[in-house]
Amino acid sequence: EYLNFVADMYGVSEADRKARMEALAERLDIKNALPNLISECSHGMKQKIAVIGALIHEPKLILMDEPFVGLDPIAAHELKEIMAEHCRNGGAIFFSTHVLEVAEKLCDNVAIIKNGKLIAHGTMDSVRGDGSLEQVFLELEDHKD
């Protein structure tokens, strides 16, 4: 019902919603759980449903808060693929993560926010330089206000 509610909010046709729901549910290995109530779902399943809800109306811009938390490794890999496809097709994704390696692998641009303040931003190469994003973060952490 949640996914139909989201699709209704964005005016997604019955045919499009069904096709998108089935395709995304298949990719995220949650197809058999779609008829269940959300309250019956595990945290990982709820996360997958939230991802499908974010994508069902095919937005150009997607905002995600820690989208990989609670996902099994296969679903996390598939979500990374979905995100990369979205960007290759002209979309953009803003997402938060505490796993810097994920940001390094997925992002073209990065912003580091600490205590609500933007402390570094730019292309991945310009922020990272010759080191890793983790090294940059640790250096910024060492130079506290």
Residue ranges and their predicted role:
Residues L37-C41:
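Conserved ABC ATPase signature
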Residues N4-D8, A15-A33:
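Conserved ABC ATPase "signature" region
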Residues I62-D65:
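Catalytic Walker B motif of ABC-type/P-loop ATPase nucleotide-binding domains
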Residues I56-K60:
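A short, proline-enriched helix->beta-strand linker immediately N-terminal to the Walker B motif
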Residues A76-N89:
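Helical segment within the ABC ATPase nucleotide-binding domain
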Residues H121-G122:
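ABC ATPase "signature
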Residues A103-K105:
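A short, surface-exposed alpha-helical micro-motif characterized by mixed small hydrophobic
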